[in-house]
């Protein structure tokens, strides 16, 4: 690759796509010809790993090249591991540098079409401190939150009954505190500052509004379509969003075809509620989920066709992936609505099991990368940041730890061994698993210190709660569960000192790596604190009259870019 080439860059990220859902990764029941075409014309990674098994922390790591614990984009609570309210005050800190910001500074036109889910506002409704336009994107068209079942009035809300119960219990407990404090104050037993009473009363009110709004306002408040800083649909028309996003992406490519551009197309597919166009309904052999996968593949094809029509294909790096593994728990009666993770154990929300973090990884750049290559080395979504920095002709900043590695030597065939020696797999703030890729051989060891408890037992998922816990209802392993992933990728045969002579030395090496890794961590504000994640009326984006927000400006505005 010539460093002054500055290719166009198109990043395609699916939402909750299982690595086993694509034909090029072994699926024979769903048709994905366009993604398969990318794989046959490019390089396919078979051990490509998300930095987290949940969307928000995974996307934060993807954009910054850093473990999400470094930016505070992880939760210490099982209740909130991704943002549940658009009117919260947490988000990707503005002092984090995204690859979009790097490329923007190097002359690229940058656009994000689709899902964001990394926060919106800090202190007031319109400050938009976490907005994509404050993280290096010139243009944004999409959903600042995400697509949930709540966005369809006819579907069961994803704010589950157990969450509502916890919100109600918290409301009652917090409401009792100021009441109990008023008794000694008025009885003059001892003095209680009014400020303390007010704080507890305010918290009780916020928890109450979160509980109350979960019964009817979530669609109106969370399901919003924006162009740059403007709300254009509230609530969004979920059945039309995919078509609108595709139209915007094609317009972006056409507008900037004569200058280097970065287009990050962040699909709403294949997250539940699996909304597909009529022409795709019933098309696949795998029900509603398969229909949604096939519609996503069709959209990929339209983007590739646009690059071909504009004669940009040879000068464009195209990358396809997913933010995490398939979600196993969503059900419609007895029918599973989530994806398939192939031979890999576990799924979305499970900190260390392969099924939650092993994702597709496909790169196509016809003028640079050899077609049809397959790479089995451990790689990470965090690698995109340093890779794009290299491609864009820049040098990585030295003022922070970057956990990703430049993939170009591996992709071009100039290197045969991944630069990742250790990878750390977190579940929220808790380190669950460590992966060690030995420098002198192809062996990849994986040690689980914590694993989730499946319910019902033996099902391989957490159907009782909708998603597995990071702490509390988990199993701690001492010594850890050890697997040789290079020989046992399904994690079916745990090793022990009796059947693996290197067991003790491998564990010792990993524990030394954990200590070294933890020395590189510095305290940062936690974006998933209780205060940051609860709903705040003064932060709620609203087009129209609050709280009955609503508008539809989409028909009045044509696709555009700055």
From Swiss-Prot:
EC numbers for this chain: 3.1.6.-
Q: How is the cofactor bound?
A: Binds 1 Ca(2+) ion per subunit.
Location in the cell: Membrane
Specify which residues bind substrate according to the UniProt entry for this protein: 115, 271, 348
Q: Where are the transmembrane segments?
A: 167-187, 189-209
Q: Answer whether the UniProt record assigns the keyword Phosphoprotein to this protein.
A: no
Q: Which cofactor does it need?
A: Ca(2+)
Q: Which Pfam families match?
A: Sulfatase, Sulfatase_C
Q: Which GO terms describe its molecular function?
A: arylsulfatase activity; metal ion binding
Record's GO cellular component terms:
endoplasmic reticulum lumen; membrane
Q: Which residues bind Ca(2+)?
A: 15-16, 55, 323-324
Tell me where the signal peptide lies.
none
- Disulfide topology: none
Q: Which UniProt keywords apply?
A: Calcium, Hydrolase, Membrane, Metal-binding, Transmembrane, Transmembrane helix
InterPro entries the record matches: Alkaline_phosphatase_core_sf, Sulfatase, Sulfatase_CS, Sulfatase_N
Residues where 3-oxoalanine (Cys) occurs? 55
Q: Which residues participate directly in catalysis?
A: 55, 117
Out of the domains of life, which is the source? Eukaryota
Q: Does the keyword Transport apply?
A: no
User: Which SUPFAM superfamilies is this protein grouped with?
Assistant: Alkaline phosphatase-like
Family per similarity comment: Belongs to the sulfatase family.
Q: What is this protein called?
A: Arylsulfatase H
Q: Which organism is it from?
A: Homo sapiens
Q: Which gene encodes it?
A: ARSH
């Amino acid at each position: 690759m010539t460093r002054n080439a500055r290719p166009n860059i198109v990043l395609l990220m699916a939402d909750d796509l299982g690595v086993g859902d694509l034909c090029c990764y072994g699926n024979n029941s769903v048709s994905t010809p366009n993604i398969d075409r990318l794989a046959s014309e490019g390089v396919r990674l078979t051990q490509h790993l998300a930095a987290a098994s949940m969307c928000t922390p995974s996307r934060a790591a993807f954009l910054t090249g850093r473990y999400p614990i470094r930016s505070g984009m992880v939760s210490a609570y099982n209740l909130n591991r991704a943002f549940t309210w658009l009117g919260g005050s947490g988000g990707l800190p503005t002092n984090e540098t995204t690859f979009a910001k790097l490329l923007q500074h190097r002359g690229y036109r940058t656009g994000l079409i689709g899902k964001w889910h990394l926060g919106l506002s800090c202190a007031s409704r319109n400050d938009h401190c976490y907005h994509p336009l404050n993280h290096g994107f010139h243009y944004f068209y999409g959903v600042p939150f995400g697509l949930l079942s709540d966005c369809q009035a006819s579907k069961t809300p994803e704010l589950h009954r157990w969450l509502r119960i916890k919100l109600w219990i918290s409301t009652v407990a917090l409401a009792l505190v100021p009441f109990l404090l008023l008794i000694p104050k008025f009885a003059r037993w001892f003095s209680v500052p009014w400020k303390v009473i007010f704080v507890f009363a305010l918290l009780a009110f916020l928890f109450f509004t979160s509980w109350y709004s979960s019964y009817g306002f979530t669609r109106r408040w969370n399901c919003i379509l924006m162009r740059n800083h403007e709300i254009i649909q509230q609530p969004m028309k979920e059945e039309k969003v995919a078509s609108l996003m595709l139209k915007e992406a094609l317009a972006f490519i056409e507008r900037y075809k004569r200058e280097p551009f970065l287009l990050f197309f962040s699909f709403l597919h294949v997250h539940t509620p699996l909304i597909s166009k009529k022409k795709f309904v019933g098309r696949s052999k795998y029900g509603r989920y398969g229909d949604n996968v096939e519609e996503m593949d069709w959209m990929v094809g339209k983007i590739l066709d646009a690059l071909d029509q504009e004669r940009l294909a040879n000068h464009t790096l195209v990358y396809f992936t997913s933010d995490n593994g398939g979600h196993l728990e969503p059900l419609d009666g007895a029918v599973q609505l989530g994806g398939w993770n192939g031979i890999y154990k576990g799924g979305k929300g499970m900190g260390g099991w392969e099924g939650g973090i092993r994702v597709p990884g496909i790169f196509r750049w016809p003028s640079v990368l050899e077609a049809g290559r397959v790479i089995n080395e451990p790689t990470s979504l965090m690698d995109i940041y340093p890779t794009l920095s290299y491609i864009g002709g820049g040098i990585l900043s030295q003022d922070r730890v970057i956990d990703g590695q430049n993939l170009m030597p591996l992709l071009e065939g100039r290197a045969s061994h991944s630069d990742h020696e250790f990878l750390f797999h977190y579940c929220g703030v808790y380190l669950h698993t460590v992966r060690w890729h030995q420098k002198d051989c192809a062996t990849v060891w994986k040690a689980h210190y914590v694993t989730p408890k499946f319910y019902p037992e033996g099902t391989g998922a957490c159907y009782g709660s909708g998603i597995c816990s990071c702490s509390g209802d988990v199993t701690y392993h001492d010594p850890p569960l050890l697997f040789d992933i290079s020989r046992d990728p399904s994690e079916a045969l745990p090793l022990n000192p009796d059947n693996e002579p290197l067991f003790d030395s491998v564990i010792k090496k990993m524990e030394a790596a954990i200590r070294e890794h933890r020395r590189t961590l510095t305290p940062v504000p936690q974006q998933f604190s209780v205060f940051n994640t609860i709903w705040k009326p003064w932060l709620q984006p609203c087009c129209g009259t609050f709280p009955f927000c609503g508008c539809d400006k989409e028909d009045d505005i044509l696709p555009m870019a700055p």
